[in-house]
Amino acid sequence: MSAQARAKRPWRGVLALDAAIDRRVTQPRKRGITMVIDKGIGPAALADIDAVAAPYIDHWKLAFGTSALMPPQVLADKLAFLRERGVLTYPGGTLLEAAVVQQHCRVFMQRAEELGFTAVEISDGTIDLPRDRRRRIIDCAREAGLVVITEVGKKDPQCQPEAAELAEQALDDLKWGSSFVIVEARESGRGIGIYDKTGELRSSFLEEIANLLGDKIDQLIWEAPQKEQQAALVARFGANVSLGNVAVNEVLALEALRAGLRFETLAAVADREKASGQWDPDMPEPDEGPATRESARQELRHD
């Protein structure tokens, strides 16, 4: 984070807040990705979100088949707006699965590029894809000039693969040219993948995937639509864990959680600081002195 960027923060100079925010890697990010799920907002709403949360948005997924139903000019305007800001855009994987069933994979990739998408999500959450077919679809997307994002896992709660299967598929996808791998959880985050039917994290399942991925773990994007899930993953992997299926209006809330500026993560930070002796609740705040206070006032006057 540059000094110039830090100086523009509303709460600059409050060292604890600066330190909390500085824990995050900055754009363009290769880890600590926030993937937003868009179920159909318009250009005005997109501009509003950009105005308040642009530094915290990395990927933008137009959910399931919504991009096929949107007015063409609206879709074009949204994709152009996001592309100008360096945000990776892709349609939901279900749309590609529908094209694969009709043997239209290559046409789909060409059309995605023409429409202005910069990436594509390749999944088999609904259909079954043989390994070789999946690899060839990845090749097809790359030949079309698209960044490849794959997804592992099934959407049906009754057909959930084991952790080792998910990890093996993720490693194969990365070897075949995928830039990131999303771990399926759907929009509900219940009974799918790393979550049980109540939405709680299946810790042993998660740890098995993490252990098998090893140093590739930063290329996983964990779908985490619920606040409690986001908090649990931040607690496990740190502020720079990659999270997906984040609601459009929850981007800033997630960033506050990452920075330890919400109850769910601040409590852990406070406990850690207290245990290490860095913070003593009984110790009064030191007097900064009039010179320091006057310097702060001068800084505010010259903004």
Swiss-Prot record:
Domain of life the protein comes from: Bacteria
Pathway info: Cofactor biosynthesis; coenzyme M biosynthesis; sulfoacetaldehyde from phosphoenolpyruvate and sulfite: step 1/4
Keyword annotations: Coenzyme M biosynthesis, Lyase, Plasmid
Composition skew (Basic and acidic residues), residue ranges: 290-303
Catalysed reactions, as listed in the record: (2R)-O-phospho-3-sulfolactate = phosphoenolpyruvate + sulfite + H(+)
UniProt-listed Pfam families: ComA (PF02679)
Tagged with keyword Repressor: no
Ranges where the record places region Disordered: 273-303
Lyase among keywords: yes
EC number: 4.4.1.19
Function: Catalyzes the addition of sulfite to phosphoenolpyruvate (PEP) to yield (2R)-phospho-3-sulfolactate (PSL).
Anything else known: In Xanthobacter strain Py2 coenzyme M plays a role in epoxide carboxylation by serving as the nucleophile for epoxide ring opening and the carrier of the C3 unit that is ultimately carboxylated to acetoacetate.
Family of this protein: Belongs to the phosphosulfolactate synthase family.
Protein name (database record): Phosphosulfolactate synthase
Gene: xecG
